[in-house]
Amino acid sequence: MASLTKSGVVYDARGLVEPDPEPPMTAQIDGDSAVIDATDLSTRKINLELKRIVYDEGVNNVTILNPGSKHSLGVGILKRCNITFEGSPGWYACGLIDGPEVQINGRVGWSLGENMMSGSVVVEGPSGSLTGAALRGGDLVIKGNVGARTGIDQKGGTIIATGSAGINTGFMMQRGRQIICGDVNDGLGDSMYDGVIYVGGNVASLGVDCVPGEMNDDDVEFINRKFRIYDLGTPPDLKKFECGKVLHNYDALEPSERKLVL
């Protein structure tokens, strides 16, 4: 037996939201564009409607109104298209995407773009912790601060934050690049395998095996290109940090040395 809450969201007998797997068919479609008003829709209904109009209707430009900080919006879209959120999604927005170009005119919660493969997500505000967790490709651009553990387990792609970043940014980073224009809290690049982190402000402390690097012409070209693409103005003076290649090269260490490093 299902129950209806005051907000209009339906729950099944186990308390799991939205047992109905059918899209609501409420989007306003006009040629190659569509608008979804998410005010009275559950997360599942919003995502079902988004996938319907992108895959079944072939719409390439979608605007989602009133996302209401609902979690897990815009996930699993595996097609090139343009998606605009007018308002703020909650946690886990735009995870597991491969191709979309997403514009978020608001702020966003934890784990933005988790396991993103390609495309871009631009946020006109801050983002929470775990931004770009396990990012594999594409660009995440946050016009503001990002929280703790940004780019944890990052495997590719680029994360740009015009503000500051929290603790353990770049933790266990494997590949890819980050550009943090402001300050970074303790543990930058802790246990990173590879990749590069550029920082414009002060670093509270470096994590294990994260060391300063030397900027070169390729770094400058890359940074200038990304700032030009996303109209971010002139880049600040940035410092480069990279992996010292000690922690994870165990074959080159004696057992006693491993204990010291760890």
Model-found features: residue ranges?
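Feature marks extracellular polysaccharide-active and adherence modules
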Residues: 65-67, 76, 84-88, 95-96, ...
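A structural signal for beta-strand register positions
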Residues: 120, 139-141, 158-160, 177-179, ...
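Intrinsically disordered, low-complexity terminal regions
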Residues: 1-66, 72-73, 167, 174-181, ...
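Active-site-adjacent structural elements in folded domains
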Residues: 127
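Beta-strand repeat architectures
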Residues: 51-61, 72-81, 92-100, 111-118, ...
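Glycine- and acidic-residue-rich phosphate-binding/metal-coordinating active-site segment common to enzymes
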Residues: 148, 154-167
